[in-house]
Design a protein with these regions (language model features):
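Gly/Ser/Thr-rich phosphate-binding loop
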Residues: 42, 54-110, 119
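Alpha-helix/helix-capping structural signal
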Residues: 48, 71-72, 133
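AMP-binding/adenylate-forming
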Residues: 1-52, 91
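AMP-binding/adenylate-forming catalytic core of the ANL superfamily
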Residues: 43, 144, 150-199
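Nucleotide-sugar-dependent glycosyltransferase donor-binding/catalytic pocket residues
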Residues: 3, 74, 154
Length: 199
């Protein structure tokens, strides 16, 4: 694991003495072979990883729980993954490096729990997180008592605290758990022989 969420999954599995199956860098058919071989029951990954499992060809009934996290997902991907793993309970986790896991969702809509609803604000569609939910670090900069997450949301039901993530406020996007600057990617792509322009 190379990221905070990966470390959390690793240590949770380690403490529970669960078998870990390394599928990093493997082709789609190799991943499915290992799921069958080891009767994998839990998968925790980014939407990018789950998209690599497409297209749907077969059901895998050993999988009991699927967890999405690390980047924005969508309803279509949840539905397709449910077709592949029909017996799995599917959760979508919102976590930040600064605060850890904060919300879980069944689909692409998240709900702020009533018990901590007063620890969040939304300003100009950006989700702000209260300092009491964050670890202690000199690298955090606060606006009063709130940390700017740079995550933009849209309310589905503001009264009930239900929202959906729209995008990021800054240029950095999360791809497979890595922070990526699309502008830098564009420069590299444009340097390839035969590429005139990328958009």
């Amino acid at each position: 694991p190379t990221h905070m969420a990966g470390l959390q999954v690793f240590f949770q599995a380690f403490e529970n003495q669960n078998t870990l199956v390394n599928v990093f860098g493997l082709a789609r058919n190799e991943v499915y072979s290992l799921i069958e071989k080891y009767s994998v029951t839990h998968i925790s990954a980014t939407p990018t990883f789950y998209r690599l499992l497409l297209p749907f060809e077969k059901e895998y009934s050993s999988v009991q729980r699927i967890t999405f996290g690390g980047e924005k997902s969508d309803r279509h991907l949840f539905d397709v993954i449910h077709d592949i793993f029909p017996l799995a309970k599917i959760n979508n986790i919102y976590a930040s490096t600064e605060a850890g896991s904060l919300f879980a969702a069944k689909g692409d809509c998240f709900q702020i729990p009533v018990s901590i609803r007063d620890k969040f604000m939304v300003v100009d569609d950006e989700l702000l997180i209260h300092r009491s939910l964050l670890g202690r670090s000199e690298s955090f900069s606060f606006d009063g008592d709130y940390y700017h997450s740079n995550d933009l949301i849209e309310w589905v039901d503001q009264q009930e605290g239900i929202f959906r993530f729209k995008s990021r406020k800054n240029e950095l996007i999360n791809v497979g758990g890595y922070k990526v600057n699309p502008g830098e990617v564009e420069v590299v792509i444009n340097a390839i022989d035969g590429i005139r322009q990328s958009l």
